[in-house]
């Protein structure tokens, strides 16, 4: 093995740049064993790979102008890495959901490769924070400052941060139902149902009583409410007309004062005059009348008032059953 002079050995080795060159210039001389003879060389021995790898990256106080050793660089880098790891999750948790801003310029990303994720989350209009403390304060104050602005769209999307009195100003029907409560609604429904049932029972009872006063050809003929009302109207009109006819006949007999024979004949004539009301009654009570074919309709309980019908007044006042005039009798 031949010995090379230090100058030639330094020229043949690759040149160190940056921080490696500074460390090589500041390191003390080393001893090299050549052919059993120990000689000093000005060339620095190769440092450990982990130290060189950590020192090669740019960080706070890691450049040639920093003047710090490998131990200081390692501690500073570890502190910066731990702080960056602690800062990135805090930024992601504190920042509310919203449209992702545009990425930062390439120059800022190249200068801070370890904080690239942090730079992309920051707004594009502001530069990247220089100190970690400022970045943490910015990430905490950003959601509070942008809540009132239009960055998140409508303010109604965050009702817990905004005061919205629209519900108090314009209450909806659903809120009224919630205010009433289920117990009040059930009690009101029960009261309404009982009142309607009681009213319907009264109406049905009144129709049943009216049906008993209307004579029909089949006595047990089934009639609807509409038919009961129509037959009752016809029956009342028939009775009113019959009473008017009887009153007119009595007035005529009192004026004429005829003999009993003529009076008897007049009585027969009165009976003949009473035939049309009988025919009208038969027409009203016949099952083929127009009332039997009428459609059933809903009758209002207030459309009529229950009045006692006359008890067979037509039969008691029929002309054939009237007493004879005074002085009349068989001769």
UniProtKB/Swiss-Prot annotation:
The modification Phosphoserine is found at residues 12, 122, 172. Residues 1-22, 72-86 have a biased composition (Basic and acidic residues). Pfam families: HLH. Gene3D superfamilies: Helix-loop-helix DNA-binding domain. Keywords: Chromosomal rearrangement, Developmental protein, Differentiation, DNA-binding, Nucleus, Phosphoprotein, Proto-oncogene, Transcription, Transcription regulation, Ubl conjugation. Efficient DNA binding requires dimerization with another bHLH protein. Forms heterodimers with TCF3. Binds to the LIM domain containing protein LMO2 and to DRG1. Can assemble in a complex with LDB1 and LMO2. Component of a TAL-1 complex composed at least of CBFA2T3, LDB1, TAL1 and TCF3. Interacts with SBNO2; this interaction inhibits TAL1 occupancy of the DCSTAMP promoter, leading to the activation of the DCSTAMP promoter by the transcription factor MITF. This is T-cell acute lymphocytic leukemia protein 1.
